[in-house]
A protein has these predicted regions:
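Short, surface-exposed loop and linker segments with low hydrophobicity and enrichment for Pro/Ser/Thr
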Residues: 1, 7, 90-98, 171-185
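N-terminal export signals
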Residues: 2-3, 8-27
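Intrinsically disordered, low-complexity boundary segments flanking structured domains
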Residues: 61-69, 88-91, 174
Length: 195
């Protein structure tokens, strides 16, 4: 290879490296959330930290939540779920946990049990998926329920499988729970793992 050819190859390599480095400064594509980014200015909530490559559909069905939390009576719910992933994920979905965020209305007895187990004001509120924040009324006071107490009241130990005929089992663990006794509302962040 001639001297000129080597310089050309090195020059192209440097130019390509610079382009890649500067490409990281480009704005994110629409419909994507990056770790730490909170696309809403609602200061009541902690930052949303999950990577979401596409906008999630907000679900309102209760079946999956009722099966995961048999210790409470859910009247209505708005929730989302997605396999946990990084921007460049290498693990197949079935090998990753599922994160679930939700805002639920509970019956008064369920709310009372959670409120009695709470440990103080939730400030900030759990960093739920930004599309769910519209279902949390402003001006309401939420209290934090410690994980162990929330898990016991929600009775996650007795959760039911979606498909009992499958050999694999799931575990459901709450990570953050906040309750508003006045509005019978529960905000939660949970993870589900398949074994």
């Amino acid at each position: 290879m001639t001297e000129y050819g080597r310089r050309g190859v090195v020059g192209m390599g440097l130019a390509g490296g610079a382009a890649l480095a500067l490409g990281g400064c480009a704005p994110a594509q629409d419909g994507r959330s990056w770790p730490g980014a909170t696309p809403t200015s609602d200061g009541r909530f902690a930052g949303f930290t999950e990577y979401v490559p596409v906008t999630l559909e907000i679900r309102t069905d209760l079946g999956r939540l009722d099966r995961r939390m048999p210790g409470v009576t859910i009247s209505s719910a708005h929730w989302v779920m997605q396999y946990q992933q990084e921007q460049r994920e290498v693990l197949p979905p079935q090998d990753r946990p599922i994160w679930i965020h939700g805002v639920m209305t509970l019956d008064p007895a369920s709310t009372r049990a959670l409120a009695e187990a709470s440990s103080g004001k939730a400030d900030p509120l759990p960093g739920i998926y930004p599309g769910l924040r519209q279902y949390v009324p402003e001006g309401k006071v939420f209290t934090t329920v410690p994980k162990e107490k929330a898990d016991a009241i929600l009775d996650i130990e007795h959760m039911m499988q979606d498909d009992p005929s499958r050999f694999e089992s799931s575990s459901f663990d709450t990570e953050q729970v906040a309750v508003c006794a006045d509005a019978n509302l529960l905000i939660f962040i949970a993870r589900e793992r398949h074994t």
